[in-house]
Each structure stands twice: as C-alpha cells, then as structure tokens.
C-alpha cells in the first residue's frame, strides 16, 4: 500500500510493528485510505490500562483471534490505533504513548493535541 504516506513531521511514514503485524492493510505501517473508516493512523505503545479501556469499550485487543491471524496484544506491543479511540483514552488520561515517526499525518485530522504534546515513547524506543 505504501504510496509514500507521511508521518506527523511530514516525513516518510516509518514502520509501527511487524511483530505483531499491524496497520489497516497489515503492512506494519499505520497507512490509511478512504476504505479505512476507523482511521487506524496512530502508532501507540500498548499499556495494560489502555488495553483494558479498549476492552471495556467493546474492542478486545487482548484475546487472540487465530482465524484472523491475530495473536492478541500485550503491554509493550506497538499497534496502529483508530485516532478516535486514542483521543477517547487521552480525554480519560489513559492514552498510550505514541510513536510519532510511525503515526500517520492523517491522525492530525482528529487529534490536534498531538501537535502540542511531547512524545516520550519516541525517546525511549530510539
């Protein structure tokens, strides 16, 4: 899919995770298109708190789903999240840290606070 999509720094979008494989297109990147109604553009570092929050909202990211080759997520995994779900978690003070260079610029259509926050996960993972 990579038609040279950009990250929030207007640079080429970097890989979020290939283990587990993430992204709307399961390319490892938070690429998007008009088909991606959920806007899976935020590369985030999973936490126990966020995974439980998502589960309580009806999106079980913890349990494995073998028929979709989904191993289930655990704290420390990186995953392309829907921008709206990340924003909901942010408003509840439990948003996971983002990986800016792997977060699609289209996330900024929904999450303007990303323009103003520092990104501790980038520092820890580089």
What are these regions (language model features)?
Residues 2-74, 85-93, 99-112, 118:
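A charge-rich, low-complexity, intrinsically flexible signal that marks solvent-exposed coils, linkers
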